[in-house]
Amino acid sequence: MSGIEQLAETVATDLEQRLPGQRKTQRDKLALLVATMLQVRSATLMDVAACLPRLAERLDSRYQWIKRFLANARVVSDAVMAPYGREVLARLSAQGQTVVLLIDQTKVSERHQVVMVAVRLGGRALPLAWRVKETQGAIGFAEQRAALEAAARLLPAGTKPVLMGDRFYGSPDLITWCSGQGWDWRLRLKQDLLVFEDGGATTLAACFRRGEHRLRDIELTEKRVRTNVAMVHEAGHPEPWIIALSQAPSVHTAFDYGLRWGIEAMFSDFKTRGFGLEDSQIRLAGRLDRLILIMALALFWAVSTGMWDAVHRPTPAEKNPAMADPGAMPDPSLPCSSGACGAFTPAFTA
């Protein structure tokens, strides 16, 4: 039995425990594709087919087998990801940590963009939910809301996360949605947005020029959405950060926005520095969605393996916190344990 087949068996066992209602054939195929993706690290289906351990079939038959799986509408990404996301969020909440959710968009093909909601963990991010859309520009609020609602369903009762997003997401609609959910937010704003305060109208850029860097309970845009705003401008940076936030505005709360960079590292894992998602040449949104699902599960396994290794076989830098990046250091209490197939483990099993 090859290493891919051994890992696929372990992934399939994990999927059976998490998704007992899913058809066994779907779980087994998904497990085999996740294991192969971890080996190949390529979104090119022919590369995946070349390593897929189905020796009785020709290469073109294996390629068609993958395409049929990606076309299977019964494989629903939200449903498959739910137990993984739910466990990570529950453990973060149980440890008393603030759950930091990140939202961002990236180009996944010449025709498609994906908006993704992720959770920050150990200085990086793990995907929770996403929506793929055929578009050349920004994905609208309807798809953002759908991905956020899918992620919200995974939160433990009583958990109040903070949502972070860049200037695509500093919108009145999203601020209103967060407020309605009882979430906190740190959302970067465009400088030309209108501000209404004390009966007058101005822009955020004008406020910044006047030295008004902390605005409390202002009304934003013609929709008159209420929020606080904090502005900071570090030396050497071309533009200030203008951050809408739910809590009292301060330099400290504005710099919280920097936590969102974890999702950029995650997108690199999906794309140029990892699986090469943008090279898939897939033309249909549903198939791209399920390819992202395969990569997302592979990423959960890879990250949990790395975190387990850092705890149990630390490098000198990991042994000495003064030498390491504190934001990237794993917590020994995180649910990473040794398992079959070398160090690969079901992501965040107890």
Feature locations, PLM:
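Short active-site-adjacent helix-start/loop capping segments
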Residues: 57-59, 77, 109-112
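Residues within the helices of the helix-turn-helix
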Residues: 46
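Short hydrophobic beta-strand that contains or immediately precedes a catalytic carboxylate
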Residues: 102-103
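Short, basic interhelical loop/turn and adjoining N-cap
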Residues: 52-65
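Short, basic alpha-helical nucleic acid-contact segments in DNA-binding proteins
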Residues: 69-84, 88
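Single, function-defining residue in the core of a domain
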Residues: 1-42, 50, 80-82, 94-99, ...
